[in-house]
Amino acid sequence: MAAKEVLFGNDARVKMLAGVNVLANAVKVTLGPKGRNVVLDKSFGAPLITKDGVSVAKEIELEDKFENMGAQMVKEVASKANDAAGDGTTTATVLAQAIVTEGLKAVAAGMNPMDLKRGIDKAVVAAVAELKNLSQECADTNAIAQVGTISANSDETIGEIIATAMEKVGKEGVITVEEGQALENELDVVEGMQFDRGYLSPYFINKPETGSVELESPFILLVDKKVSNIRELLPILEGLAKTGKPLLIVAEDVEGEALATLVVNNMRGIVKVAAVKAPGFGDRRKAMLQDIAILTGGTVIAEEIGLELEKATLEDLGTAKRVIITKDDTTIIDGTGEQDQIQARVAQIKVQAEESTSDYDKEKLQERMAKLAGGVAVIKVGAATEVEMKEKKARVEDALHATRAAVEEGVVAGGGVALVRVASKIADVEVINEDQKHGVVIALRAMEAPLRQIATNAGEESSVVANNVKNGSGNYGYNAGNDTYGDMLEMGILDPTKVTRSALQFAASIAGLMITTEAMVGEVPQEAAGAPDMGGMGGMGGMGGMGGMM
């Protein structure tokens, strides 16, 4: 086992603080509408230019192992804030740095670290409760657009496109972000339920100009098995011929004689029909077939529940207003299922998603939920260069997370104002000694740090701005974007409550651990072994005769 180096007390804390400061100073320059860029070196390709706090934090590794421990702990703050709310990473880093700096000063002055931590924790609990009181619901499209704009570093086009996407697919809908091909951002909305399975035969195509199958008001047959014998389908096809309506078959597979007969019937115009494979595999396929059944008001024909295809009737079929099938995917528009059953299914999937421990499963469950709830929106990010594309895509993803957080827990005044107002209301938190009281004071001072940093990044004197804001009341604050003071909510400067709350809680949690650190243990660097002696190569002198090779 390698030898270890151990630092105690103040020596450990000084090293740790140095690491915290390196990381936090690199991250905090990105805060606010006038935040600066940070350029990240990449081992291949162009350097990455970003204003995303967590992207900067993830890149930082320090040579000194003890300083690096401090930096890694603050990196954890940024990562946790990002995981919980998808934004607020820079705010969390600034808060953590402020709490650690003041806390370590107090420890050096002889205060009890444990009591300081208790005081900080009490202040944070009171602050979170007060934030919830200040929070306002974020319901209308305009407020959602404003939240997105602020999170995307004041880019209004990003805020607006996210608000439009949410309006079209609903609050539960899936919104994904992709790299686009154009210079401008684009929004693609797939209404209805789409799954990635195309037609089983090109002979089903009835729209040659688009290479697709379009069925108006079709019946939909859902079968959880392979269909290869046409006799199983005859009762359904005979019933359909009388109605004159088209049929979509969704089955594990349709093959052989069954597929050939369907193609012939379709080409002769006897029955308008198309067949596709069911989406997914195994248990997920069964679940998705059930989703389609609920959406269209049909029943899944499955032998394991005692239903046979030969005995199926038109009552077992689902219906929809329209179905569009391309070679790659199928879209069912306006299924005629009962709305209360659809809502119950969405609620059931939501519970499964919350309980799931796998990110992949969670993502797939959310997709299923969105397809039932309203649709899927894809934001295609446009840019002139690859470097700009990557930077912009990261901002769009941040803004999307922030708007989801705003819809979930509401919004508070942005620009660091909410934390300043909270600090003024919780100054009299109950404590049992002077050291705890000082812990509360440390937390209250730290709550001003985001506002001060926004002002500093905008080129203003932070103390003057902080005083002006503290002298105001309610939502009165400083708009660094245009260097004015006023009501932050009226100016459209909003922060999601969840983002502000998460940033404060995670910053205080990690900072509290750092203040109460008394020793640090790291490996002693090993000297690299020297290269082997090349003395045995002396006999190579005889190579001189090689000159004749020229």
Swiss-Prot record:
Entry binding sites for ATP: T30, L31, G32, P33, K51, D87, G88, T89, T90, T91, G415, D495
Gene: groEL
Function: Together with its co-chaperonin GroES, plays an essential role in assisting protein folding. The GroEL-GroES system forms a nano-cage that allows encapsulation of the non-native substrate proteins and provides a physical environment optimized to promote and accelerate protein folding.
GO CC terms, sorted: cytoplasm
CDD domains xref list: GroEL
Name the record gives this protein: Chaperonin GroEL
Biological process (GO), any one: protein refolding
SUPFAM superfamilies named among the record's database cross-references: GroEL apical domain-like, GroEL equatorial domain-like
A GO term, aspect molecular function: unfolded protein binding
Organism: Shewanella woodyi (strain ATCC 51908 / MS32)
Source organism phylogeny: Bacteria, Pseudomonadati, Pseudomonadota, Gammaproteobacteria, Alteromonadales
EC number(s) per entry: 5.6.1.7
Catalysed reactions, as listed in the record: ATP + H2O + a folded polypeptide = ADP + phosphate + an unfolded polypeptide
Subunit record text: Forms a cylinder of 14 subunits composed of two heptameric rings stacked back-to-back. Interacts with the co-chaperonin GroES.
Family designation: Belongs to the chaperonin (HSP60) family.
Subcellular location: Cytoplasm
Enzyme class, UniProt record, top EC level: isomerase
PANTHER family: 60 KDA HEAT SHOCK PROTEIN, MITOCHONDRIAL (PTHR45633)
Transmembrane segments: none
Assigned keywords, A-Z: ATP-binding, Chaperone, Cytoplasm, Isomerase, Nucleotide-binding
The keyword S-adenosyl-L-methionine appears for this protein: no
